[in-house]
């Protein structure tokens, strides 16, 4: 089928000519497998590999894995065009269910980490492209603030349900963002 034909072309025209020797030197192996086998390997695995997928397969499987091993709200995505354009985004989409609750005036505990990291990725890239190191430094500090806030036990509901930290403080969306801001302010001082 299409997948095995595409893999054969890749192996002959790209891998064998450009990467086979480099992989061998580094003790890395390349192999093609069908998506069902790849999924089974991932579920049993502890990592240590790169999994290249076609767009749809990669989209669905990365969402599945992020959810299975933590929270979809912790995963970002970067789209890179052949023309050198970059788009940073939260991989989870719009979280409509929470948005509709918000419209009704109901409190939500939506995890904004993926959206924050989409912004930090874009800021870091912009700083790189325009040679403005301060943008990258700010992005690094904001990401550090997110991590420290969670490590200090302040988190949204999705993380509070899976954390191993004792007595996590479950925050609504706005309070979590305020906590990240307070941590960022202390890091920037």
Regions found by a protein language model. Give the residues of each.
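Short, conserved loop-to-beta-strand elements that form functional interface hotspots
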Residues: 29-39, 163-165, 188
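Single conserved hydrophobic/aromatic residue that forms the stacking wall/gate
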Residues: 1-6, 10
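Glycine-rich beta-alpha junction loops
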Residues: 4, 37, 56-58
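Amphipathic alpha-helical segments that form well-ordered structural scaffolds
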Residues: 14-18, 118, 179
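Internal helix-turn-beta structural module
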Residues: 104-110, 125-188
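A domain-level signal for the structural core that forms small-molecule/cofactor-binding pockets
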Residues: 39-40, 71-72, 79, 177, ...
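A glycine-rich helix N-cap at a beta->alpha junction
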Residues: 12-35
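Glycine-rich phosphate/nucleotide-binding loop
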Residues: 42-141, 148-149
């Amino acid at each position: 089928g299409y997948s095995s034909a595409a893999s054969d072309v890749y192996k002959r025209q790209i891998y064998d000519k450009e990467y086979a020797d480099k992989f061998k030197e580094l003790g890395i192996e390349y192999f093609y497998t069908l998506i069902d086998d790849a999924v089974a390997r991932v579920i049993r695995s502890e990592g240590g590999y790169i999994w290249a997928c076609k767009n749809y397969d990669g989209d669905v499987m990365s969402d599945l894995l992020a959810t299975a091993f933590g929270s979809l709200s912790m995963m970002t995505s970067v789209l890179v065009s052949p023309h050198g354009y970059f788009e940073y985004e939260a991989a989870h989409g719009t979280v409509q269910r929470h948005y509709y609750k918000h419209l009704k005036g109901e409190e939500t505990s939506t995890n904004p980490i993926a959206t924050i990291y989409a912004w930090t990725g874009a800021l870091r890239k912009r700083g790189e492209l325009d040679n403005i190191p301060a943008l990258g430094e700010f992005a690094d500090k904001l990401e550090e603030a997110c991590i420290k806030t969670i490590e200090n036990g302040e988190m949204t509901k999705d993380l509070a349900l899976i954390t191993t930290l004792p007595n996590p403080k479950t925050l609504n969306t706005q309070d979590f963002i305020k906590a990240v801001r307070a941590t960022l302010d202390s890091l920037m001082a």
